[in-house]
């Protein structure tokens, strides 16, 4: 009978010291707390924050761009080829516009009353 009484005292001791009842092994977000009452309020608050942060972490999947999500499917080569083709097309159009502008300046197609000092020509 003395053993049963001693076990009950050991189980109630953390509650008498002002500590909260926690699962054995620490559980999620466990931090050891001191026995004084001043640290218990901060411990409880931090425990809640840690649990909240862990619950929110899986919700960040929406922030991953689709290109990265599809990388595992073997579509990298196609995406890169499409990107390179777009870059070649942009460069071609840019060279065409620059050449057209330079030809207009050099051939004097602009009206004579315009001042050409502020214009420039980039030769490809």
Swiss-Prot record:
Tissues expressing the protein: Widely expressed.
The record's account of how the chain is modified after translation: Ubiquitinated. Degraded by the proteasome.
Consequence when changing residue 97 to A: Abolishes nuclear export and interactions with itself and p75NTR/NGFR
Effect of residue 121 to S: Abolished zinc-binding and association with FEM1B
Positions bound to Zn(2+): 121
Compartment(s): Nucleus; Cytoplasm, Cytosol
Renumbered residue ranges of the record's region Interaction with p75NTR/NGFR: 81-106
PANTHER family, per the entry: PROTEIN BEX1-RELATED, PROTEIN BEX3
Record family assignment: Belongs to the BEX family.
Domain description: The nuclear export signal is required for export from the nucleus and the interactions with itself and NGFR/p75NTR. The histidine cluster (His cluster) and Cys-121 mediate zinc-binding.
The protein's name in its UniProt record: Protein BEX3
Organism annotation: Mus musculus (Mouse)
Origin organism lineage: Eukaryota, Metazoa, Chordata, Craniata, Vertebrata
Gene: Bex3
């Amino acid at each position: 009978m003395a053993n049963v009484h001693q076990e009950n005292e050991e189980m109630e001791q953390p509650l008498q010291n002002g500590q909260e009842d926690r699962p054995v092994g620490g559980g999620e977000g466990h931090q050891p707390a001191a026995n004084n009452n001043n640290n218990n309020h901060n411990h409880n608050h931090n425990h809640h924050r840690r649990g909240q942060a862990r619950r929110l972490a899986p919700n960040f999947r929406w922030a991953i761009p689709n290109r990265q999500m599809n990388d595992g499917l073997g579509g990298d080569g196609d995406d890169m080829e499409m990107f390179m083709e777009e870059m070649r097309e942009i460069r071609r159009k840019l060279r065409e516009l620059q050449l057209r502008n330079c030809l207009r300046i050099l051939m004097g197609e602009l009206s004579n009353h315009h001042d050409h000092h502020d214009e420039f020509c980039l030769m490809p």
